[in-house]
Amino acid sequence: MEIWVNNDQEIVEFTEEHEELIRRVAERALELAGAGLGSNVSVSVTLVDDETITDLNRDHRGLASPTDVLSFSQLEGEDMGDLPEGEPMPLGDIVISLERCVSQAAEYGHSFERELGFLTAHGMLHLMGWDHQTPEDEARMMAKTEEILAGLGLSR
């Protein structure tokens, strides 16, 4: 699995340990929820501030407010059969607001690392086709997210 992590904000300190955490969570999510995808996939994770994610949220969802994570899947309606042999299949892009990550960690009473892991897992599940439009889907997605995090020592 190829994972590109880009820190495009300067408000929240972002360390190599945080980048490694994102990689471990993304790999674990693929392992537990990516049935049929294999491991030759790629994903990008971009870390932004609230201003940037507000702009993206407005442009793509029509909501002029910050959010914690956005996912842009490459699998939706795409034919990936034309990829050159050996090239990783692009799952898509995850955008995480580190400002939201800090505030939500404080609000929920857990660590920044646990929240960063949660947002990464949540974004990965969306890239792999999971959603939370119904209460049943939301419960299923939350349970899978918690399973991913528990396997990495990030449970509540």
Swiss-Prot record:
Q: Its family?
A: Belongs to the endoribonuclease YbeY family.
* SUPFAM superfamilies referenced in this protein's UniProt entry, alphabetically: Metalloproteases ('zincins'), catalytic domain
Q: Which GO terms describe its cellular component?
A: cytoplasm
Q: What is this protein called?
A: Endoribonuclease YbeY
The record's listing under InterPro entries reads: MetalPrtase_cat_dom_sf_prd (IPR023091), YbeY (IPR002036), YbeY_CS (IPR020549)
Q: Which controlled-vocabulary keywords does the entry list?
A: Cytoplasm, Endonuclease, Hydrolase, Metal-binding, Nuclease, Ribosome biogenesis, rRNA processing, Zinc
Any one Gene Ontology BP term? rRNA processing
Species this chain originates from: Symbiobacterium thermophilum (strain DSM 24528 / JCM 14929 / IAM 14863 / T)
Q: One Pfam family, please name it.
A: YbeY
Which Gene3D superfamilies does the UniProt record give? Answer: Metalloproteases ('zincins'), catalytic domain
Q: Does the keyword Translocase apply?
A: no
Function, please? Single strand-specific metallo-endoribonuclease involved in late-stage 70S ribosome quality control and in maturation of the 3' terminus of the 16S rRNA.
Extract one GO molecular function annotation from the record.
RNA endonuclease activity
Q: Which residues bind Zn(2+)?
A: 122, 126, 132
Which regions span the lipid bilayer? none
Main localization (coarse):
cytoplasm
- Named cofactor requirement(s): Zn(2+)
Free-text cofactor note: Binds 1 zinc ion.
Q: Does the keyword Hydrolase apply?
A: yes
Q: Which domain of life is it from?
A: Bacteria
- Its EC number is 3.1.-.-
Where would you find this protein in the cell? Cytoplasm
